[in-house]
Amino acid sequence: MSKLNEIKKIYFIGIGGIGMSALARYFKSRGVDVSGYDKTSTPLTRELEASGIAIHYEERVDLVPKDTDAVVYTPAIPAQHAELVYYREQNYTVVKRSDVLQWITEGSFNICVGGTHGKTTVTTMIAHLLRHSGYGCNAFLGGISANYQTNFWSSERNVVVVEADEYDRSFLKLVPDVAVITAMDPDHLDIYGTPEEVEKAFIEFSQKVKPGGCLITKQGLSRASELKAEHQYSYSFEDTGAAVHATNLKVQKGSYCFDVVNKDWIMKDVVLHMGGLHNIENCIAAITVAKYLGIEEEKIKVAVADFKGVRRRFEYALKNDQHVLIDDYAHHPEELRALISGVKSIFNKDKLVLVFQPHLFSRTKDQADGFAHSLDMADEVIILPIYPARELPMEGVTSELLLNKMKITNKQVLTKEEMKIWVAAHQPKLLVMAGAGDIDALVQPVKELLENK
């Protein structure tokens, strides 16, 4: 922790990233002088600026602070970035986001949530249950909590709830007292190379659990027998072989009511207002953590009923008798499958139109068959051009690759502008927009096209 106390001034390269902005808010809350760079202004960077954090949007060495104690960068920043190169050449303390999380969590009780999907919702649910029940925690989230409109909060209690990101193996720097693993599906193969390497990293993550600690895993993970800790629970939506699972599910006006069952206890009539059957499973993971920590059942139930979700996770951008518009971060075949089946569990009579923006050329290429299979679950699909993020184009890897593998007939690749024209003309009753790129910037214009008819 001594490293942290020495920092009076800190600079973030890529401050607008979801994980980076949480760290920026953490240091700001400690009275540290925080500033940063990002390549574009977003609602999130504007929130940071409003809190007193100086941000510039040009890659210029003359704009960076020369008296900073530490420089934090994200893996999404290219190695040749002028500001990063400058700080390295001048021998400043230059660290990754994961190094800073390691410093923060060295002396705390840590609840670390990992998994190739589901982790943001589970992390946010756990942090919300702990905050709402009065247990208290410091939270570093990979999404914006709809309850608190932030991805970070602090507490006097020396407990940290943190999203453990497997990208570039950064989660292996954390030492959990409680670890949750939500999924181990192949992802980030640009880093790991093979699905087996992804699994190996998660097994290593489970081995980081402190002696006497607890490991909570989704039922049915591959190589589950290699995931071991002193206290261990599996969870599932409906697999009764799991240590904790749901039963007696009822859908009421887009909300879910269910019981949660363990061999030692049963929690009756849990009400969750967040859509998507996969979110019942995410909720069970969070409840399992809360029960392990000894939080009272009634406090857990009240907190779950008050959970408003995570921005861009099954988020209703518009919901009235004429139109439903759902915005979601899904960018992996399994997430898309869960999203579409979740929407259909609530709106089973309506035609589901999906607008999907693929994220990364490498992921599109590696998971093309899986994407096509999941996209085929929708009634009609519009695919936008691939969002490149940190990557250069790959030959033969375009949105048409997915289109050609799909079996349904109502499908097309459109530009963003063409998609807006299509929405204005067709006025779909049930529209889902999914992706991790910049598709979220289209949600408001699409909402207005639906509202103004």
Describe every region a protein language model picked out.
Residues 66-70, 158, 427-429:
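Short acidic/histidine-rich motifs immediately flanking catalytic phosphotransfer sites
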Residues 3, 26-32, 49, 62-66, ...:
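Phosphate-binding loop of NTP-binding sites
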Residues 36, 139, 179, 217, ...:
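Structural beta-sheet core signal
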Residues 2-9, 19, 23-26, 30, ...:
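Nucleotide phosphate-binding/pyrophosphate-handling subdomain across enzymes
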Residues 33-47:
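NAD(P)-binding Rossmann-fold cofactor-contacting core
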Residues 37-38, 56-59, 95-99, 140-141, ...:
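Beta-strand->loop->alpha-helix junctions that form or flank phosphate-binding loops
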Residues 372-429:
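C-terminal helical cap/extension that packs against the catalytic core
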Residues 10-15, 434:
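Conserved N-terminal Rossmann-fold NAD(P)-binding element of oxidoreductases
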